[in-house]
């Protein structure tokens, strides 16, 4: 939930703390972003997050690794248009000396037509 709040606030410092420097993030558009691309695209780009809600959250923890799956509803503004879409999300988190950090994420294709 801290990641969702950081996205909506465009809080670059918080995202840098939450995301692992070796991050590999696959977007629903099938683009694979590294750490710098992910942070910049979510805090300085044309994409503005308004809200993100997670439903049916499931977490499995084994030692210093956690896998989260959820249905996610994203509310964003892109190119001046308000959009809302729902995707299946998988994240892998690892416990580090700095706390839990997201090492990888994958957002599936949006379900249903975008609203907005």
Where do the model's predicted regions map?
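Short, aromatic-enriched amphipathic alpha-helices that serve as compact interaction elements
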Residues: 1-10, 18
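Hydrophobic/aromatic beta-strand elements that line small-molecule binding cavities or substrate pockets
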Residues: 3, 38, 54-60, 72-74, ...
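A solvent-exposed, acidic/Ser-Thr-rich amphipathic alpha-helical stretch
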Residues: 12-62, 83-85
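Short beta-strand segments enriched in hydrophobic/aromatic residues
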Residues: 19, 72-74, 106-109
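Beta-strand residues in well-ordered beta-sheet regions across diverse protein folds
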Residues: 26, 69-71, 103
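Short, cysteine-centered beta-strand-loop-beta hairpins and adjacent loop/turn segments enriched
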Residues: 75-84
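Short beta-strand edge/turn micro-motifs at domain boundaries
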Residues: 86-113
